[in-house]
């Protein structure tokens, strides 16, 4: 890869003035060779493999950050879904495995570890059910472990028994963790991807190599600055500006990923192009949409503006790298985006509008705080709606929702750090309890007739 001096100067400006960073270098680690019928042996095997494969990740990230002057905010680990790895143990709880993941991740100094996961889009094995029922206690007794459940796919349909259990699991987690914070580390997916470097939904897919490096970049501030400084008038020209900017962002991520791969002697997997916001001013996806001409994110036209942004980011990124993967789009996490927070506080950005926006962007209803008395079946209904959008449109969708115990609409909750804070948003008054309790499976959609 040849780098021009002009690109270097642009990168310096992106970092210094526009909040550009490499959000994460994530090592995916396969744990199939750790399987044992004895859960204590399994835990020791898991600890040994993670601490062996990942031991140099943090030092490498610090070296590359200093060498290139680009912040690398997080170093993370993702592992094979634990429901698959722990099944042979026949244990009635996998909380000890979560605690082992937590201990191993802390030992090597990473920010988060993902993969306390179950893939149940077509049905639940006994091990899958044990894992899902272990999630609340696992989130309570660990600090940096992230969990995910894949409840549907375009090919399998939606497993409504799993959707019901997921809603109950989130509700229980909210009740036993301070201000529901444990729920910030749980994602429920439809069409989950196997090479996602971002938390909380990262896991290492069964089709992946023994270890792989996946990189996530972040540059909402860079895109907004490019639009501010351009003379684009039509939306066609806006799309072109975004596309060219995404190309530049992606080139930096590609460089960091391939350098990390060489230093760690681990294959380079993918570069995730997702625009991932932070609560910092100037690092917001919502403000990009407003720069396009919306008075406030969430008003009419927001979904169209987001569709333009998402598509232009993908087009620009694909020209800059042959290893684009993961989720690759725009994230819209309410609590992690100061523009989204402001729009939600103003009452313009609602749960319904966010649901519509997820039909055209990366992932889905993300980091949304709802009243603590929200029933489990309502959470399951929200998950089912989001999964349906993903299933029908052949895309990844997800829900990361936090029922905040003791809080109601109008209150707010502080999560801190990259997770930010969120206003508590209202949910519908009507009940979907009978619908959710029916269980079964929503069949996979027909593919030949698309309307």
Curated annotation (Swiss-Prot):
Pfam families: DUF711. NCBIfam families: PRK05313.1 (NF003700). Belongs to the UPF0210 family. This is UPF0210 protein NMC1568. Homodimer. It comes from the Bacteria. It comes from Neisseria meningitidis serogroup C / serotype 2a (strain ATCC 700532 / DSM 15464 / FAM18). InterPro entries: UPF0210.
């Amino acid at each position: 890869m040849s780098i021009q001096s002009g690109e270097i100067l642009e990168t310096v400006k992106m970092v210094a003035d526009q909040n550009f960073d490499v959000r994460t270098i994530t090592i995916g680690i396969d744990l199939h060779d750790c399987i044992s019928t004895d859960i204590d042996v399994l835990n020791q095997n898991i600890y040994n493999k993670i601490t062996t494969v990942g031991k140099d990740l943090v030092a490498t990230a610090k070296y590359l950050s200093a060498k290139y002057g680009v912040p690398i905010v997080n170093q993370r680990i993702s592992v094979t879904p634990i429901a698959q790895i722990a099944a042979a143990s026949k244990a009635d709880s996998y909380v000890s495995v979560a605690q082992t993941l937590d201990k191993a991740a802390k030992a090597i100094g990473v920010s988060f570890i993902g993969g306390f996961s179950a893939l149940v889009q077509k049905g639940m094995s006994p091990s899958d059910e044990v894992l899902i029922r272990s999630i609340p206690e696992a989130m309570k007794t660990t600090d940096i472990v992230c969990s995910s459940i894949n409840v549907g796919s375009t090919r399998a349909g939606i497993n409504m028994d799993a959707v019901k259990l997921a809603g109950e699991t989130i509700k229980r987690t909210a009740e036993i963790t301070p201000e529901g914070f444990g729920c910030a580390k749980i994602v429920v997916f439809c069409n989950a991807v196997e090479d996602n470097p971002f938390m909380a939904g990262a896991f290492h897919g069964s089709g992946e190599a023994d270890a792989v490096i996946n990189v996530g970049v972040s540059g909402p501030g860079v895109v907004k600055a490019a639009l501010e400084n351009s003379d684009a008038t039509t939306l066609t020209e806006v799309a072109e500006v975004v596309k060219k900017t995404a190309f530049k962002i992606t080139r930096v991520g590609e460089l960091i990923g391939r350098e990390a791969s060489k230093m760690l002697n681990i294959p380079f997997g993918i570069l995730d192009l997702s625009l991932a916001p932070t609560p910092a001013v100037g690092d917001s996806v919502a403000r990009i949409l407003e720069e396009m001409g919306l008075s406030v994110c969430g008003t009419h036209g927001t979904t169209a503006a987001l569709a333009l942004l998402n598509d232009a980011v993908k087009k620009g990124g694909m020209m800059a790298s042959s290893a684009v993967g993961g989720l690759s789009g725009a994230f819209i996490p309410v609590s992690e985006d100061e523009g989204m927070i402001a729009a939600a506080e103003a009452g313009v950005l609602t749960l319904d509008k966010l649901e519509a926006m997820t039909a055209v962007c990366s992932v889905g209803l993300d980091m949304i705080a709802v009243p603590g008395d929200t029933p489990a079946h309502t959470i399951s209904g929200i998950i089912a709606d989001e999964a349906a959008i993903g299933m029908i449109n052949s895309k990844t969708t997800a829900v990361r929702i936090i029922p905040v115990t003791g809080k109601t609409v109008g209150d707010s909750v502080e999560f801190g750090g990259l997770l930010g804070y969120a206003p508590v948003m209202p949910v519908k008054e009507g009940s979907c309890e009978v619908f959710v309790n029916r269980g079964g499976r929503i069949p996979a959609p027909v593919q030949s007739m698309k309307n």
